[in-house]
Amino acid sequence: MVRGVVLFPGAGSSRDHAALLAIEKELSPLPVLRVDFPYRKAGKKFPDKAPVLVQCVKDEVRAFAREIGCDTTDLVIGGRSMGGRMCTMASSDIEDALLIAGVVCIGYPLHPPKKPEQLRTEHLPRLATKALFISGTRDEFGTPEELETAFALLPSPPAVQFIEGGRHELKGHDERVATLLKDWLRTV
């Protein structure tokens, strides 16, 4: 049984992103922690390098598990765009994998817009946890076809939900995203 959820924002937003707030509301009374990355807390606009962000994910998740009195394996982690990607990297780290119940990625940034050759998939074959990917069918960071090809790299098939007409930001779909996550948590 999932004991809590830890969420991280995308590169251009904060822990107060509408989607993360909607998820917290939908999952109540389940404990939800929304986290800002260190660069955001320092007032910087541009993200730190991936190792710093991944370490932040590990540190925050482990601290939250201690705070609510559970193991990290009782938690689901994830987030929007870069936040979700960093969570997949933390849980597939070769040297110090963060053991969790599952990971959710909202708008996984498979590649930079208009640069489909720059795939961010190197770690996916090591992602050995339950996973939910939610993306729009018009996401500039990965088409449904590109994402399905990338998801085939995972050791076991993830749950995938595409929101018709949604772009990367999934504006106007926050409640739908929250409901999809809540429904998926019942399977974890």
Predicted regions: what is each one?
Residues V2-D74, R85, M89:
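Serine-hydrolase catalytic machinery in alpha/beta-hydrolase-like enzymes
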Residues V6-G10, G107, S135:
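The conserved beta1-alpha1 loop
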Residues A11, T137-D139, G165-R167:
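Acidic beta-to-alpha connecting loop that harbors the catalytic carboxylate
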Residues D16, E140-E146:
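Conserved alpha/beta-hydrolase "acid-adjacent" motif
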Residues V57-R126:
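Primarily recognizes the serine-hydrolase "nucleophile elbow" in alpha/beta-hydrolase
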Residues L127-A128, F133-S135, D139:
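Short beta-strand/loop motif that positions the catalytic acidic residue
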Residues G166-R176:
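Catalytic histidine-centered segment of alpha/beta-hydrolase-like enzymes
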Residues L180-V188:
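C-terminal alpha-helix
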